C-alpha cells in the first residue's frame, strides 16, 4: 500500500515559509503525540536550523502516557524544548509563554544590551496537516483567530497573530513532504488522519493497524469490541462488524464499515491511549 499526498498548494506554502523564516526567532513545531517522529516534517530541521526550537506534542490525551514521557526525553536530549499538551482542553497550555521566553532568552538578553526593550518574540507555528496547529493557536490566544477543522489542509493562507506584548505567532499551512522514504511513516500518518481518507484503502489500513494492536496492545480490541484476538485479522474485523451491527443490506458483515469504525475509534481515543512508535534509545 503506497501512501502519498502532496497537493500543489504545499509547494507554494513551503516556498513562502522559506521566505518568512527570515523574520522569525523561534520555530514552534507541533507533532502528534501518537506518532511524534513520523509527524515531524524532515524539511523543518533544515528550515529552522539557525532558530530556537520548541516541539509541542499535541493530542497527548490520546497517546500512551509512558511513551509520551519517553519521546519527551528523546527530544530534549536532541536539544529541543518540549511540551506535551492537549490544545482542545488547554491541558499543558499554561506553561507555553514561559517556555517560549526561556527558549529565546539569549535573543531577549541580546536585545536588552542593545537598548531594545519589549520587542516581542516572533514565532512560526509549523506542522503537518491535522496535528492541531489552529486549535493550539486559538487556545493559546483565547479567541478563534485561526480556522480550524478536522480535515487535513484547512489552513491555507499566512496570518500573524499578536498574542500579548511578549509573543507574536505566524501560522502556516500544514505541509507534508514530497516522498515518504519509509512507507511505515505514511501508514502512521494515514492512521492519524494527516492524509486524506479519500485517497486511502481503508480496509488495508485497518488490517495493518489491527496487526499492530495485537502485537503492541494485546487485549484492547477484545475489550472494546468483545471479539477474540485469537482469530486471524480478517476474521477479527469481520467479528467486529457483526458485534457492532456493521452489516450489508443482506445482513452480511460489512468489512469496510468495520474497518472504518476501528480507525475512527482510534482517532477519537475510544480504543484507549495508543502510541504507534517508540524512540530508538
Please give the residue ranges for each predicted region.
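Active-site cofactor/substrate anionic-group-binding motifs, chiefly glycine-
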Residues: 51-61
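Canonical P-loop GTPase G-domain recognition
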Residues: 61-127, 145, 246-247, 253
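Short, structured loop/turn "capping" segments at alpha-beta junctions
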Residues: 107-111, 138, 144-150, 216-220
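Anionic group-transfer/hydrolysis microenvironments
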Residues: 31-34, 60, 140, 173
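Helix-rich effector regions associated with P-loop NTPase G domains
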Residues: 1-26, 34-43, 47-53, 81, ...
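Glycine-rich phosphate-binding P-loop
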Residues: 122-142, 146, 172
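Structural beta-sheet core signal
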Residues: 29, 55-57, 125
Amino acid at each position: 500500500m503506497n501512501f502519498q499526498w502532496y497537493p500543489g498548494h504545499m509547494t507554494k506554502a513551503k516556498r513562502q515559509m522559506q521566505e518568512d523564516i527570515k523574520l522569525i526567532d523561534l520555530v514552534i513545531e507541533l507533532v502528534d503525540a501518537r506518532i511524534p517522529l513520523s509527524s515531524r516534517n524532515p524539511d523543518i530541521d533544515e528550515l529552522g536550523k539557525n532558530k530556537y526550537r520548541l516541539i509541542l506534542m499535541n493530542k497527548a490525551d490520546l497517546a500512551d502516557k509512558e511513551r509520551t514521557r519517553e519521546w519527551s526525553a528523546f527530544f530534549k536530549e536532541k536539544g529541543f524544548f518540549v511540551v506535551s499538551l492537549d490544545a482542545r482542553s488547554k491541558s499543558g497550555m499554561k506553561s507555553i509563554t514561559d517556555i517560549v521566553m526561556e527558549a529565546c532568552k539569549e535573543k531577549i538578553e541580546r536585545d536588552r544590551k542593545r537598548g531594545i526593550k519589549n520587542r516581542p518574540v516572533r514565532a512560526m507555528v509549523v506542522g503537518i496537516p491535522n496535528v492541531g496547529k489552529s486549535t493550539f493557536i486559538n487556545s493559546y490566544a483565547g479567541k478563534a483567530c485561526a480556522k480550524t477543522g478536522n480535515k487535513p489542509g484547512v489552513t491555507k493562507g499566512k496570518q500573524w497573530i499578536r498574542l500579548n506584548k511578549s509573543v507574536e505567532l505566524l501560522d502556516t499551512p500544514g505541509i507534508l513532504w514530497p516522498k515518504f522514504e519509509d512507507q511505515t511513516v505514511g501508514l502512521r500518518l494515514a492512521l492519524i488522519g494527516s492524509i486524506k481518507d479519500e485517497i486511502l484503502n481503508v480496509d488495508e489500513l485497518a488490517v495493518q493497524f489491527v496487526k499492530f494492536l495485537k502485537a503492541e496492545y494485546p487485549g484492547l480490541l477484545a475489550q472494546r469490541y468483545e471479539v477474540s484476538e485469537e482469530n486471524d485479522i480478517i476474521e477479527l474485523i469481520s467479528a467486529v462488524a457483526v458485534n457492532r451491527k456493521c452489516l450489508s443490506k443482506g445482513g452480511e458483515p460489512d468489512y469496510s464499515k468495520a474497518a472504518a469504525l476501528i480507525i475512527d475509534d482510534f482517532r477519537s481515543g475510544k480504543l484507549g491511549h495508543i502510541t504507534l512508535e517508540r524512540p530508538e534509545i
